[in-house]
Amino acid sequence: MPELPEVETVRRGLEPVMEGARIIHVEQRRADLRFPFPAGFSEHVKGCRIEALGRRAKYLLLHLENGRVLVSHLGMSGSFRIEESGSDKLRGDFHYARSKAEKHDHVVFHLARHEGGSARVIYNDPRRFGFMLLLDSADLEAHPLFAGLGVEPTGNALDGALLARLLAGKRAPLKAALMDQRLVAGLGNIYVCEALWRAGLSPRRIAATIATREGKSTGRSERLAGAIRTVIAEAIAAGGSSLKDYVQADGSLGYFQHSFSVYDREGKPCRKEGCSGTIQRFVQGGRSTFYCPICQR
């Protein structure tokens, strides 16, 4: 499933084409994805100017001039691609559209761009676990999808002091706590594994032990907060990780998977200088966890 860096990469890829463009027409080729489309979906967005493209956790947010927000979640295999007018080439690296996947093109946005010309933005989703919703912008933060979301792991908002307060008293394993979207929004399996390795903390450790009993920051919470921010920033800069179904909006692949230190490296030597450990895998919360039992404590 695409995680926060992948969704942010898609947002940045779509932004130059979609922001400021007007939606001339929407081809909705089926009645549902994971959930049914909102009633009158195509008509509600037709003719609207896209004011801004945002992101909250793993959700893409298209802010429309009519006061509504088109919320899109990529699910397991959802992706967007861009086709410029007069060409079937994808913008950017000139990857041609993959004809075998066209049967999974479920939504096509026909756009008039603000600087002139036109484009099509196509949503493709073989497994159909993604979805699209239309919400009034005033109701966005109160909607069940967003009301309980925690702090974003980007920028400086997530520091050691805040992380200590969030995890104080939590008896869950540290990895499970970090993936609780009510605490930190947008973190997923891959990047939690990587951040824990960088911070030298075991995914099995009780979450509360990175803080004092009073919920104050410690060296552990400071290291972990810094590792989370750095891993997310580096993954965004690398265009995310191309595992299975994920591609960027221009059709190209992400490259952060080439920087993995623990994820999907079971049985390989730990990359930390001076560590003699071997990366191990175990199932935690129904997901594969990768870590070094020597340097992660």
Curated annotation (Swiss-Prot):
Catalytic reactions of this protein: Hydrolysis of DNA containing ring-opened 7-methylguanine residues, releasing 2,6-diamino-4-hydroxy-5-(N-methyl)formamidopyrimidine; 2'-deoxyribonucleotide-(2'-deoxyribose 5'-phosphate)-2'-deoxyribonucleotide-DNA = a 3'-end 2'-deoxyribonucleotide-(2,3-dehydro-2,3-deoxyribose 5'-phosphate)-DNA + a 5'-end 5'-phospho-2'-deoxyribonucleoside-DNA + H(+)
Residues where DNA binds: H104, R127, K170
GO biological process: base-excision repair
Pfam families, sorted: Fapy_DNA_glyco, H2TH, zf-FPG_IleRS
Zinc finger (FPG-type): 261-297
Entry keywords, A to Z: DNA damage, DNA repair, DNA-binding, Glycosidase, Hydrolase, Lyase, Metal-binding, Multifunctional enzyme, Zinc, Zinc-finger
Keyword Lyase in record: yes
Catalytic residues (positions): P2 (schiff-base intermediate with dna), E3 (proton donor), K58 (proton donor), R287 (proton donor)
CDD domains registered for this protein in UniProt: EcFpg-like_N
EC identifiers of the protein: 3.2.2.23, 4.2.99.18
Cofactor binding note of this UniProt entry: Binds 1 zinc ion per subunit.
PANTHER family: FORMAMIDOPYRIMIDINE-DNA GLYCOSYLASE
Family according to the record: Belongs to the FPG family.
Function description: Involved in base excision repair of DNA damaged by oxidation or by mutagenic agents. Acts as a DNA glycosylase that recognizes and removes damaged bases. Has a preference for oxidized purines, such as 7,8-dihydro-8-oxoguanine (8-oxoG). Has AP (apurinic/apyrimidinic) lyase activity and introduces nicks in the DNA strand. Cleaves the DNA backbone by beta-delta elimination to generate a single-strand break at the site of the removed base with both 3'- and 5'-phosphates.
Protein name (Swiss-Prot/TrEMBL): Formamidopyrimidine-DNA glycosylase
Organism: Chelativorans sp. (strain BNC1)
